[in-house]
Amino acid sequence: MSPKTETKASVGFKAGVKDYRLTYYTPEYQTKDTDILAAFRVTPQPGVPPEEAGAAVAAESSTGTWTTVWTDGLTSLDRYKGRCYDIEPVPGEENQYIVYVAYPLDLFEEGSVTNLFTSIVGNVFGFKALRALRLEDLRIPPAYSKTFQGPPHGIQVERDKLNKYGRPLLGCTIKPKLGLSAKNYGRAVYECLRGGLDFTKDDENVNSQPFMRWRDRFCFCAEALFKAQAETGEIKGHYLNATAGTCEEMMKRAVFARELGVPIVMHDYLTGGFTANTSLAHYCRDNGLLLHIHRAMHAVIDRQKNHGMHFRVLAKALRMSGGDHIHAGTVVGKLEGEREVTLGFVDLLRDDFIEKDRSRGIYFTQDWVSMPGVIPVASGGIHVWHMPALTEIFGDDSVLQFGGGTLGHPWGNAPGAVANRVALEACVEARNEGRDLAREGNEVIREASKWSPELAAACEVWKEIIFEFETIDTL
């Protein structure tokens, strides 16, 4: 041991346990442009002061452990430690606080969501001194976001590939989600695309099961979309789910999709994992494939208000890891999603620069610089009567995806697709004429149904179907 090292390691070291706040609570700290900033919702155990709880989060998600260690003297804690720099009580909640933590950029591997999350949402979430812990938001500095490729292509490139502008895109998840043979599955794909949809989709749990192996499904779906393209003169796509049990198998499926000449593949990014997702996103950019992302398992992580991680963080992570579409709730359908909160993370997916706005749950200003945007997908319990609201809420840069709302049409799959396309075109035309879809939406649909029997039949079937439940994901 050199004299210099010996002195650094031994001078000032005192074994034992001391409060986290003595080292990691630094309210005087001025955050840097290069810091990664986190907003945690912290519920301390009884008797634990908020300063100690906040400092514990900063410590256990960065350089700290439960006791002092002599190896602290071999490095510069001031350079590498996370810092709890602000604490504010949550209005209306007893013993709950928003804790702000700043992390030095050098704590994280470049271009790795996996490494970022392993630290910030790792073991600290099981820390006994906390009753509950939720990550509400992250500020990703450009110095870090620029180390990621991001989405394979982005919104503008996708529109150019599809030659479709000025309206939301239409999709449909093939149902029943499990049990169809590959040929019957392909038939449903063809009928929906021929009827006017832009995309059809594998359900998230369709991988390669005994009733339908992946290669058979890929072949029949490719045949269906090329036939529909020839008949309609429009570019069509089917989200071929490449998710698999190993990264090697996932990549093999993506390669086969490219060889078939289809425009888009799909991945379940949370169950598949960020490492696999980032690898697939890089392949998709290099080989001209669009990448649709499903968020299966997200509600396990994000639905509880006081513990876990808000979906806006998962959305930011996906934009960095890579995806051209991601499911983002509907506001009006069967799945969870409060309007202002949903639109907050929709903006975080699509826009280049998003201002801090606590009324929408956005804790930090986020500058994505030149990273491409992600198209939000509205899917889950929606039908033709929802079309005006969806068009008004999500705007043109979105995918509106009707599964049961297409395949449940009383006349069949193709008429279901026709009904949705007519409803969408009517809403876009009405909006472009200056009509208020929020107030006049039902009238727009009724007018369009007079000259579309397919839409009229859909309107009759679903005229009383609503999903009225109290939203859990509120501010």
UniProtKB/Swiss-Prot annotation:
Molecular function terms, GO-annotated:
magnesium ion binding; monooxygenase activity; ribulose-bisphosphate carboxylase activity
Record's keyword terms, sorted: Acetylation, Calvin cycle, Carbon dioxide fixation, Chloroplast, Disulfide bond, Lyase, Magnesium, Metal-binding, Methylation, Monooxygenase, Oxidoreductase, Photorespiration, Photosynthesis, Plastid
Give binding positions for substrate: 123, 173, 177, 295, 327, 379
Q: Where is the active site?
A: 175, 294
- In its keyword annotation, does this UniProt entry include Lyase? yes
Q: N6-carboxylysine modification sites?
A: 201
Q: Which residues carry this modification: N-acetylproline?
A: 3
User: Which superkingdom does the taxonomy of this entry point to?
Assistant: Eukaryota
Q: Which CDD domains match?
A: RuBisCO_large_I (cd08212)
What is the first-listed, main subcellular location in coarse terms? Answer: plastid
Question: What protein is this chain from?
Answer: Ribulose bisphosphate carboxylase large chain
Q: What is the lineage of its organism?
A: Eukaryota, Viridiplantae, Streptophyta, Embryophyta, Tracheophyta
Name of encoding gene: rbcL
